[in-house]
Every structure is written in C-alpha cells, then in structure tokens.
Design a protein with these regions (language model features):
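Bacterial N-terminal signal peptides
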Residues: 12-20
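Sec/Tat signal peptide C-region and signal peptidase I cleavage site
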Residues: 22-26
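Extracellular/lumenal and peripheral-membrane lipid-interaction modules
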Residues: 27-300
C-alpha cells in the first residue's frame, strides 16, 4: 500500500514494497526469546525526528533496529514499547534543542542542581550558561570542548568556568561536592561526572523512544552538534529509491489497529527540498490526512 500523508505543510508517502528490502526470516514468538530476535530493521535518510515541539534531531543517515522493550513487537503508538538501537548513523542537534533536552528532561526535577540552561556554539567550543539552583540561582558560564569516551558517550571538558561571586577552578568548585556526588552517582538522568568533566549519555538524556548505540565521533559544524555512530562510510546501505525516507524491514510491527507481518514498509517524504519532518506523537494525524494504496504483495 502506498499512503500519501499530510500534516500542516508536510507531505509524506508511506510505501510497503517487497522489492525494496529482503525480508528477514520469520522469528516466531517463544518463551525465553530475546527482544533482539523480534527487532525490526530500520534505515533512515534526511529525517528531522521530533521528540517534542521544541526538540528535534536531524538524522542525516541511520541504520539500526527497533528493539521491543516488552512483548514481541514494537508498537508505533507506544514510544515506550521499543528502543532505537543504532548500528551506524550521523545525526545533528542544534544547541538550542540540546538545551531544551537538559531543561525539560535531564534537569527537570524541582530539586535539580542546574536550571535555565542555554547553549551556544562559539568557534570550537560550547558556551553553556545556567543557574546553580542549590546556590541561590547564581548564574554560571562554562566553555567546554567535546570528545567521545571509550564507551561511546559524549564528554564535555570545562576549559573555562565563571560563576558570580563563587571561586571556580573546575567542575567540583563550581557545583560543590554534594551536587557533584549527586550527578556522579547517576541520580541525574543522562549525565554523570568524571573528575572535572561532564559525561552525557544520549541514550538516557533524550526522551522516548530512547536511542542506544555508541558514539564514535562528535564535532561542531555550523549551528549543529554532530554525532557519528559506528562507521557509516563502511556500512552496506540498502538502496532505497528516495531521498528522504524511513524504511522498516522484518518481523512484526504494529501501528494503529494494523499489525504488519514480515514488515516491509517505507515512509517517504515526496518533497526532497528539506528534511522529512516526522513526529511520532502525531503520525496518526498525518495518516488520517493522507490516502493509501495496496501493493500486489498485500503490503501496507
């Protein structure tokens, strides 16, 4: 079936075509089977993936799989039902969107040590501003360099630190031992402390559906923080005759009242002039506004 979907100014085509993907061999549900055995393969290109109205990640290219968290299949209508395990990818996020992630998710609790975070790119550094909530909302400013840890997380190393009326030679001086310990023990989701560095875990920092995988490289590019998972240049990409798309293959996938067996589905943006705007929370609105066609292979 080919479905043309439209929401606001976006237009999307949904195609299920058996010629595009070699379906994975059927893996029936069985007691004790691992979630990975029910994973749906996914490949994306030039997708603006929205987590919230003000948080989006530009997926330039990605290959991975939807791994069910519980049960035997990923469910589009339940973003907590699966994780997106990334094999290889290149994705970008603006500093403004990253600041929104920190404010709305990582440091969202009332007793969070940091509030009102803003982030800007200044040449080869991130300039991070915010308020120390436990110190009377004192303003601070930090310039950080970016690198990747051996286990695939993002390291923010403080090169310069300023805080009004507070001596700060490093991370411990700025946040204090109590707050540093709070972060170090993982009680602040998605961020840990290591000496005078902050370690950001994209898998925990971003809201559902969570992304798992190891970041291999990170760089600042224009007004974007670019993360590279694996080695996209060496990956054997499936040829999809579209520029902006999300392609799913193998096993079971449920969306709405429909469950696709031997999933073979491609969501296509027919307008290649800008990225494919996709918002999982509102995908049904796009489906309702569009129309569908059934393929000879009974694809959906």
């Amino acid at each position: 079936m080919v479905a043309f979907l439209q929401n606001r100014s976006w237009a999307i085509a949904l195609a299920a075509c058996v010629s595009l993907f070699q379906p994975l061999s059927a893996q029936k549900s069985a007691d004790g089977s691992s979630p990975e055995s029910h994973a749906v393969q996914v490949q994306m290109h030039n997708v603006m993936y929205h987590y919230a109205d003000n948080i989006a990640v530009h997926i330039r290219r990605l290959a991975g799989e939807l791994v069910p968290v519980k049960g035997d299949l990923p469910i589009f209508d339940d973003k907590n039902s699966f994780t997106l395990h990334v094999k290889v990818a290149e994705m970008a996020i603006t500093p403004q969107a990253m600041a929104n992630v920190l404010n709305q998710y990582v440091f969202a609790r009332k007793d969070a040590p940091i509030k009102d975070v803003s982030i800007q790119i200044d040449k080869d550094r991130l300039k991070i501003k915010g308020k120390l909530h436990n110190k009377g909302d004192v303003s601070f400013e930090m310039e950080s360099s970016l690198s990747v840890t051996p286990d695939g997380k993002i390291r923010l190393h403080a090169e310069k630190i300023k805080a009004l009326h507070l001596p700060a030679k490093g991370f411990m001086d700025l946040f204090g031992i109590e707050i540093a310990d709070l972060i170090k023990t993982g009680k602040v989701q998605g961020v840990t402390a290591e000496k005078d560095d902050l370690i950001l875990d994209p898998a925990q920092a971003l809201p559902p559906p969570h992304i798992t995988g190891q970041v291999r490289r990170v760089r600042l590019e224009g007004n974007n923080i670019v993360q590279v998972f694996g080695e996209p240049e060496k990956y054997k990409w499936v040829n999809v005759p579209a520029r902006n798309y999300m392609a799913y293959s193998g096993n079971l996938l449920k969306f709405g009242k429909l469950t696709m067996d031997h999933t073979d589905m491609v969501l296509i943006d027919p307008d290649p002039r800008d990225p494919f705007d996709f918002y999982l929370d509102h995908y049904r609105d796009q489906l309702v506004a569009g129309y569908t066609k059934t393929t000879p292979a009974f694809g959906l």
